[in-house]
A protein has these predicted regions:
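Cys-dependent protein tyrosine phosphatase-like superfamily
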Residues: 1-2, 6-198, 211-309
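Ser/Thr-glycine-rich phosphate-binding loops at phosphate-binding pockets of nucleotides
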Residues: 203, 207-208
Length: 309
């Protein structure tokens, strides 16, 4: 392709004036470098090609010290609506507990208002809660098996292939046993005053992965893109830092721990197959199991989707 690409940036994804570009490059270069001087600020960019075609982009991962796997769920296309998920509205992450002041400032800088914590009461014990200033809503989804699995791995009683089957079973149970909890999450998201929202559990992979998949599905994002989003946890969750004790375990046990913290396609597919077996498809599940009306789904889409530029 020939021509020029202009880049404009702003902290507000809904208001990026095209007055003074921060960078201009030949489209044929297929790349450009933009240096930001303040790492605590998050920027969104509009790329304008030949003064005609526009696309809004941002980094998906948000680097906040003390929080793993923190990422923006914006930008994904919703083909049925011909729209995209809004940037800067909906985030997902691993556990959020007490943070240093600069990390809290970064959360404030991206505007986080509501934090949905999916961890169980037993998981919260021993963790110092996040300081005041955020609306933290607990929607506990218990994965009792997880603690037993980790204990079994440490005692070298459970192997990697056994863990694989257990996580698949756990994901099937997640979509069948927690309809009320998912309904509560959707109720929070249906209130436009709660945004921006971040959803998290312990690793930001299992329960958060299922919840995020259901939300994206309700917005009309297709299954391939939902899987792509799910698998990003493999890039942004640091397993060694979450399981430092594993260094003292034999290789087989380390492999089992890697399995339990990984976002494998089979794990999300297990949940999807269970939904399809019981309800036929995800849309029917959202309506019959979770109780979302078509009007509520349209309302959620009006909040979280935006027209393509």
């Amino acid at each position: 392709s020939r021509g020029l690409g202009d880049v404009y940036k702003r902290q507000d994804p809904n208001n990026i004036p095209e007055d003074s570009p921060v960078a201009i490059a030949n489209i044929s270069d297929q790349r450009m470098t933009i240096v930001t001087t303040d790492p605590t600020k998050r920027y969104y960019y509009t790329l304008v090609f030949n003064d005609k075609y526009r696309v809004k982009i941002a980094t998906r991962n948000v680097n906040i010290p003390g929080i793993q796997n923190f990422r923006d769920m914006g930008g994904y296309p919703s083909y049925p609506t011909k729209k995209r998920v809004r940037w800067g509205m909906l985030y997902r992450s691993a556990q959020i507990d007490s943070l240093e002041c600069y990390s809290r400032r970064e959360l404030k800088n991206i505007g986080i208002k509501t934090i949905i914590d999916l961890r169980s009461e037993s998981e919260l014990r021993g963790h110092t809660p996040l300081q005041q200033g955020f609306n933290v809503i607990h929607v506990p989804i218990k994965t009792g098996d997880m603690e037993d699995i980790l204990k079994g791995i440490q005692e070298q009683k459970i192997k990697s292939d056994t863990v694989y089957r257990m996580v698949e079973r756990m994901n099937r149970e997640l979509v069948m046993n927690y309809h009320k909890e998912y309904r509560q999450i959707f109720d929070i998201l249906l209130n436009s005053t709660n945004y921006p929202v971040v959803i998290h559990c312990s690793s930001g992979k299992g329960r958060t992965g299922i919840a995020s998949a259901l939300i994206l599905a309700s917005l009309g994002v297709n299954s391939d893109i939902i899987m792509e989003d799910y698998r990003l946890s493999n890039d942004y969750f640091n397993i060694p830092s979450a399981s430092s004790y594993a260094y003292n375990l034999p290789a087989r046990s380390q492999e089992a721990i890697t399995t339990i913290y990984s976002a494998r396609e089979d794990f999300l597919n297990a949940a999807k197959e269970e939904i399809e077996r019981r309800y036929g498809d995800v849309d029917t599940y959202l309506q019959r199991a979770i109780g979302l009306t078509k009007e509520e789904i349209k309302k959620l889409q009006s909040i979280l989707l935006v027209k393509n530029d």
